[in-house]
Amino acid sequence: MKLKLTLLSLCYILLSYSQDYKPNNTSVKSNNTNFTAITNAKIHISDDKIIENGTLLIQDGVVIKSGKEINIPKNCVVIDARGKFLYPSFIDVFSSFGVKKPNRLSSSNRSPQYEPLREGYYWNDHIRPEQNALNYFEFDKKKARELLSLGFGVVNTHLNDGIVRGSGSLIALSLKGTNSERIISKKSGQYLSFERSIQTNQAYPTSIMGSMALLRQLYHDALWYKKGNIKNTDLAIEAFNTNSNLTQIISAGSRENAIRADKIGDQFNIQYVI
């Protein structure tokens, strides 16, 4: 497996709104399934593909077609964008947008803490795969405006704490609407790092080599657990195994650590996004 580093992706913001099932007591509600066509625009499909005087066809917030010769359906809302440019938005694939980092756990105990504080979870509290970004998420309009002004339309946000940090969520930076309308994917990837969690004072690991050893041990334990060889329930390992089908995103922190992370991926046949 070759070392692969992540580049920021470009894509159109596809905001799909699900069927409205909540009562609306403030106004008369009507479902609009009409098409919207943005015409005569200069559409940047990619860095080397540009459509002059192009048309972008949208239905229910989703881009259906783009091109020069697009058949515009009847009853379509047409917006003339002559002289305007349409660009895909950036996606911040490694973000903590709207997810406040937890407070550092204080302790008056001067002796080292070797045991975990949590029961029913992994033996090391720096492993926290059960965390999900949505459980800590609060939309930040001010920060969203800043990101939108820089060309970002979507963020892949997560709780930036721990060696295994849990699952992130893909969020559209829409200033209007609610979080239920902004959520593109509730679980968009599993996040990892070599950094200790500030939510615990557990002594181990104390070094980068210790973090690597702990991560390797977790993979062995997770496989052993998956085979049914551990009778006790471990909520952290169960979450880790559940998240194993997600994209695995690891924060290495340096070029040397990126190589180290890739070697761990080689060992367990995992392609990290680094």
What are these regions (language model features)?
Residues 131-135, 271-274:
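Extracellular/luminal Protease-associated
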